[in-house]
Regions:
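C-terminal glycine/acidic-rich active-site capping loop/insertion
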Residues: 103, 108, 135-221, 246, ...
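Short, hydrophobic alpha-helical segments
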Residues: 78, 206-217, 234-241
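A contiguous, mid-protein "functional segment" used to position or interact
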Residues: 219-255
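Predominantly a Rossmann-like dinucleotide-binding segment in NAD(P)-dependent oxidoreductases
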Residues: 8-96, 243
Length: 273
């Protein structure tokens, strides 16, 4: 049995969110967005080694180095996109030739949309995941605090956004948009915190693998899941290189051909077979 080191799956917040989404208590996902810019990297970082931030040595930039954990979590919770359109900027405010600024738009099998934005030139940084669902919304800030909102009707019973759309009159809408706090009558809110220290996630995912090997208990990050993040990163790159929407997974031969063009133009490493 194989595992992949996707240790962020041990974060209690993301486990709770996955449980809520998978349970269906908030209905289907309508859209999701993750802005993850909390890994500022100056030029000195990229100059540490000859392979860093190269097409031939590393295979790309932020999508293969910093963002893989979030690409994994996004798909683990929200599902695997079927279409990808991406605008990736190479060497954005940095003296490198690979992507370090990514804006990705995806579509899921149920028609839901999603965006994933990341860069390495934001020294302040943001880490915020939002998931809009039929029956509410989930917001995670800095991978430490999660707010889960449930829509409610006038009697305080759970309902959907469709129900609110059909039953709210214009007077109620006017009160809501006037900023008088009426919005709190539309939903309930739960807050969850995660204060696990650095290193906890790495040890936990390894302990999980050891327990699986010994007792057969379920893996948090089975090996076959590892390809999902690679596929999405590749689809994002191919879309950016060609300027068009691509399927996910993308055509591996077309991806390899386009990557080799960049490796050859870079002139630092041999092209890939």
């Amino acid at each position: 049995r194989q595992m992949c080191i996707r240790d962020r799956r041990t974060n209690k917040l993301y486990q709770k969110i996955k449980e809520i989404v998978a349970s269906g208590e908030l209905g289907e996902i309508r859209r999701s967005q993750w802005m993850i810019n909390s890994w500022w990297r100056p030029d000195s970082y990229y100059q540490q080694s000859a392979w860093r931030a190269t097409w031939g040595g590393e295979g790309g930039g932020v999508l293969v180095n910093q963002a893989p954990h979030q690409l994994d979590l996004w798909q683990w919770i929200c599902g695997i996109p079927v279409k990808v359109f991406s605008k990736n900027i190479n060497g954005c405010h940095r003296n490198i030739g690979v992507e370090n600024d990514v804006t990705m738009l995806v579509e899921f099998a149920n028609g839901a949309t999603g965006t994933f934005t990341t860069c390495t030139h934001d020294a302040i940084g943001t880490d915020r995941l939002e998931i809009d669902l039929d029956g509410g919304k989930i917001v995670v800030d800095n991978s430490k605090t999660a707010h889960v909102y449930h829509y409610i009707d006038k009697e305080g019973n759970p309902c959907t956004e469709d129900y609110l759309n059909e039953h709210m009159n214009m007077m109620e809408v006017a009160m809501l948009t006037s900023g008088n706090g009426a919005g709190s009558k539309l939903y309930t809110e739960e807050t969850f915190e995660n204060n696990d220290g650095w290193g906890f996630q790495h040890t936990t995912v390894m302990q999980n693998f050891a327990a699986h090997s010994k007792t057969g208990s379920p893996l948090l990050a089975p090996g076959e899941d590892g390809i999902n993040g690679v596929n999405l990163a590749n689809s994002s790159q191919l879309s950016a290189w060609t300027g068009r929407e691509v399927s996910n997974p993308c055509d591996p031969e077309e991806y390899a051909a386009e990557l080799n063009k960049l490796i050859e133009a870079e002139g630092k490493f041999p092209v890939r077979e």
